[in-house]
Amino acid sequence: MLAPTESTLLFDGPSALTRTLLITEGPSETNPQKQALTMSATVRNDGAVIAEDSFEVNPASAYPTSGRQGLGYVLPYNPERRSYPFYDPLADLVVPLDYLGAGWVAGLETYRYTATIDVPEYHAERTIDVERRTGRLLDESWTITRGPLKGLYTLSDESKAAAASAALHDVHILKSLQVMAFVTRLVSALALFYAFVLLVRRRRD
């Protein structure tokens, strides 16, 4: 489930590439009476802004609530092994984000996806690894052959370590919730069984 936060990813490559993601909560643009989450991203190359993006997002699905199609910068909880519509802000285009297979990053099992963006002014291959239960981004690479920058950009070790730490925290919370759900079901089942035993005894008496 998405929540208000701010993070910056650093990429190693021919130039200093960063992407800052900001999730805020406030009145919805379409219905000011309701609260909504807004996801905003800023991509910088050597400090200069080369792309900006902002949209209201469904906290459960990670999809935009209106205005455009395609996932932005996170995948849903429990991502599926299939293609997703993916929005690239540099090309202002929605393209397929195809499932490649399973992988590992920092000891965490991932699902790997790739997207090809090809327009006259921009061509790139983007590959991402997300933690298979939470959908949190753990690794990413851009191979750009045409556009405002060129070359291979990979997520820095610092950003990968921070992402892995956050994903591990999410996984622990998820496991705790699963244990609590199991215990709750078990207690409920025992309570029903005890009530049944009491009922049988009363009828015998």
Task: Describe the function of each predicted region.
Residues 107, 203-205:
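Generic ordered-secondary-structure signal
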Residues 176-198:
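Membrane-embedded transmembrane helical bundles of large multi-pass transporters/channels
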Residues 1-81, 150, 155-162, 168-174, ...:
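Extracellular or lumenal secretory-pathway regions
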Residues 73, 77-80, 84-184:
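Acidic, serine/threonine-rich low-complexity disordered tracts
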